[in-house]
Amino acid sequence: MYTEAARVYSLKRLCGDETSKDKFAQIGEIMSESHRSCRTLYQCSSEELDELVELAMENGAYGARLTGAGWGGCIVAYVSENNKNKFIENIYCSYYKKHLDAGKITQKQLKNCIFPSKPSAGACVIVLGSSDPVNP
């Protein structure tokens, strides 16, 4: 757990560093290190998640890792905005199509399987009557 916490602090420092070169690659490497740790040290990955992470990296992700509780959940991949549509199409063709064709997922379920998202502020405390949700 210590190394994962250290990665969180490294990521925070990196995101705040305006002078950092190759920031996308560095952030991606932190994500990939996190996945390797989950897979190797904590054994909370699965063959399917490892395959998705590998395919993500082969298709231009800066980094990828399992997210959620593991043992079957999902991955998050760090992809450039201009590559996201091609990335989604490639992951669909190389992973999800075979599961769709085999009847393991339906077309309706597929819409919930792969989609773009953006970073957000995350969880916070909101004090009613305060205009600042972070520092009430």
Regions found by a protein language model. Name each.
Residues M1-G63, A77-P136:
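C-terminal nucleotide
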Residues A64-C74:
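Conserved phosphate/anionic-ligand binding catalytic regions in large, soluble enzymes, centered on
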